[in-house]
């Protein structure tokens, strides 16, 4: 699946843009995903990881 973190499963969320006149239009917020070569399930793979997982140390980067 695209736009989903392979570690925590974070995915896009939806909501509304609300103007000053209180008009509403649909909006999608995407997670900040990075492609990283990492040790995942015992193999070195290129996975999509959100920056929160990268910063917290949930990912072991491959060299």
Swiss-Prot record:
Sorted keywords for this record are: Ribonucleoprotein, Ribosomal protein
Matching Gene3D superfamilies: 2.20.150.30, Ribosomal protein L28/L24
Give the UniProt entry's GO cellular component terms: ribonucleoprotein complex; ribosome
Q: Which GO terms describe its molecular function?
A: structural constituent of ribosome
Superkingdom of origin: Bacteria
- InterPro entries recorded: Bacterial_rp_bL28, Ribosomal_bL28, Ribosomal_bL28/bL31-like_sf, Ribosomal_bL28_bact-type, Ribosomal_bL28_sf
Instruction: List, in alphabetical order, the GO biological process terms annotated in this UniProt record.
Output: translation
**Which family does the UniProt entry place this protein in?**
Belongs to the bacterial ribosomal protein bL28 family.
Q: What protein name is recorded for this chain?
A: Large ribosomal subunit protein bL28
Q: What phylogenetic lineage does the species belong to? A: Bacteria, Pseudomonadati, Thermodesulfobacteriota, Desulfuromonadia, Desulfuromonadales
Which gene holds the coding sequence for this protein? rpmB
């Amino acid at each position: 699946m695209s736009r989903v973190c392979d570690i925590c499963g974070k995915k896009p969320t939806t909501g509304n843009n609300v103007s000053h006149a209180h008009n509403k239009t649909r909006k999608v917020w995407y997670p900040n995903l990075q492609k990283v070569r990492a040790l995942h399930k015992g193999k070195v793979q290129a996975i999509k990881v959100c920056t929160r997982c990268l910063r917290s140390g949930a990912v072991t980067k491959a060299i």
